[in-house]
Amino acid sequence: MQAGLRIDVDTYRGTREGVPRLLDILDEAQVKATFFFSVGPDNMGRHLWRLARPTFFWKMLRSRAASLYGWDILLAGTAWPGKPIGRDLGPLMRRALDAGHEVGLHAWDHHGWQANAGRWNDRQLTAQIHRGVDCLSDILGNPVICSAAAGWRADQHVVQAKQAFGFRYNSDSRGATLFRPLLADGRLGTPQIPVDLPTFDEVVGPQLQPGAFNEYILNRFAAQRLNVYTIHAEVEGIVMADGFRQLLRQADAREIEFNPLGQLLPESIEQLPCGQVVRGHLPGREGWLGVQQ
């Protein structure tokens, strides 16, 4: 059974500690994945103001965020400038590429994108993407071939802004099938590879304990599904690393074969159906996100 494995790297600590551990785990399992890196300042701690929103407060309690992520991640960029992830930790991003994994852009400023992408104008969106692409391409020594919007904060406005960068594909949305978004001028845009499986932090809580997660998520894989699964370097690369190692073993026993997302694309993208990325909501995730329509 074919599946796509996507690894989002949101923070400085996730890059420094989570990525090396994940590379070792993936090497042990002989699995290749797609890493999406945040490369600018780590300002993730600025999300704390969202605690005033009941849905975000409940999510933080439900997922036991302090123990799951660590206070250094939860406070990053609050009382001090965010550390420059790409400048300091670029060699770890190159290491992922050299190990045979697919590497793409997550964001320049992950917090900035999540907080503002829905209201930035065309110029601001393009500038953010441009900064990220320039930084990551300098680090890798290669063009950036794919991207994934931070927090799945994407809509048709974001889709249009990304067209100028010539990505092979984007993974900006939650959905069920590969598709090409319809652009304002009637053309079909860059292919979208949506995520169709929930993440650890979306489902773990009072009704599902961490130890039961692997069986829960593996039971969601099916031959007729897209089977794109997302992990986070800050979670599965640190506190849940042993659980992820076990998940890969259990997936192998079920004949689930993980691949980089780019390998899910057909030889000809002309056969992909048309769709759109619109704003929607998902259980377990606070705020809006891009969903396939």
Curated annotation (Swiss-Prot):
InterPro entries: ArnD (IPR023557), Glyco_hydro/deAcase_b/a-brl (IPR011330), NODB_dom (IPR002509), Polysacc_deacetylase_ArnD (IPR050248). Its EC number is 3.5.1.n3. The gene is arnD. PANTHER family: 4-DEOXY-4-FORMAMIDO-L-ARABINOSE-PHOSPHOUNDECAPRENOL DEFORMYLASE ARND-RELATED (PTHR10587:SF137), GLYCOSYL TRANSFERASE-RELATED (PTHR10587). Disulfide bonds: none annotated. The keyword Lipid biosynthesis applies. SUPFAM superfamilies: Glycoside hydrolase/deacetylase. The lineage of its organism: Bacteria, Pseudomonadati, Pseudomonadota, Gammaproteobacteria, Pseudomonadales. One of its GO terms (cellular component) is membrane. It comes from Pseudomonas savastanoi pv. phaseolicola (strain 1448A / Race 6) (Pseudomonas syringae pv. phaseolicola (strain 1448A / Race 6)). It comes from the Bacteria. It catalyses: 4-deoxy-4-formamido-alpha-L-arabinopyranosyl di-trans,octa-cis-undecaprenyl phosphate + H2O = 4-amino-4-deoxy-alpha-L-arabinopyranosyl di-trans,octa-cis-undecaprenyl phosphate + formate. Catalyzes the deformylation of 4-deoxy-4-formamido-L-arabinose-phosphoundecaprenol to 4-amino-4-deoxy-L-arabinose-phosphoundecaprenol. The modified arabinose is attached to lipid A and is required for resistance to polymyxin and cationic antimicrobial peptides. Pathway: Glycolipid biosynthesis; 4-amino-4-deoxy-alpha-L-arabinose undecaprenyl phosphate biosynthesis; 4-amino-4-deoxy-alpha-L-arabinose undecaprenyl phosphate from UDP-4-deoxy-4-formamido-beta-L-arabinose and undecaprenyl phosphate: step 2/2; Bacterial outer membrane biogenesis; lipopolysaccharide biosynthesis. Belongs to the polysaccharide deacetylase family. ArnD deformylase subfamily. Keywords: Antibiotic resistance, Hydrolase, Lipid A biosynthesis, Lipid biosynthesis, Lipid metabolism, Lipopolysaccharide biosynthesis. It holds the Pfam family Polysacc_deac_1. GO terms for biological process: 4-amino-4-deoxy-alpha-L-arabinopyranosyl undecaprenyl phosphate biosynthetic process; lipid A biosynthetic process; lipopolysaccharide biosynthetic process; response to antibiotic. Residues 1-259 form the NodB homology domain. This is Probable 4-deoxy-4-formamido-L-arabinose-phosphoundecaprenol deformylase ArnD. GO terms for molecular function: hydrolase activity, acting on carbon-nitrogen (but not peptide) bonds, in linear amides.
